[in-house]
Amino acid sequence: RQGAAAAIIVHEEEPAAYPWSVVENSWQGPQLDLQRDDLGAERVILESWIRDHVLDDVLKFTGFNYLALKEIALEKTFSPFPFRGLTLSSEIFNKVRYLQSHNIGAIKHGRTKPNEYILFMAHWDHLGKVKAVKPGDDIIFNGAVDNATGVASILELAKRYSEIDTERSVIFLAVTLEESGLLGSEYFAKYPPIDLSHVVSGFNFDAILP
């Protein structure tokens, strides 16, 4: 946290390669996280986003603009400084619910080196639903590319590997909640069912285009 009370991400469409609507759809409604021992105390109190041109409007009162500030922030000697006359206040009401999701995995045991592993993985989640803009619009983010193609890849690999012997063991893992911040992968890394130091190679499949 480095002493920060809040973290606000500035969205620029060109370098991000996705429009503001993706941010809106991802950050409206419930936000998911792992159940942590410190109950999230390591996170800042406020996490938010702002569009670059909206930030420019806000900064008019300070004598700065976003591009100038970005150049300053990229300098090796940069250190934080306050904006005179600019403050932020926010009021948040939230509720906590406990839900359960799953990583799904399978293992093919190796013939001569069963304690060494090749890992194939892909995330199975996507973004859920969006509010319809027009009547009759598809409200489901189907996720054919991100990431049904990735999951299909590890399923096909599992099918092919089931037909042959392998020297090392092979793990096929479909992780949850990638779109919420790689949470399924984080859980696997934190509570691995195997010794991760014995994973000799890993392949992640995400957004494979036809």
Residue ranges and their predicted role:
Residues A5-V10, L46-I50, G105, Y117-M121, ...:
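Structural recognition of the beta-strand scaffold that forms the well-ordered cores
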Residues P15, W27, Q100, G128-P210:
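Acidic/histidine-rich catalytic neighborhood of metal-dependent amide-processing enzymes
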Residues I8-P15, V54-V58, T112, H126, ...:
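Short loop/turn segments at secondary-structure transitions that flank enzyme active sites
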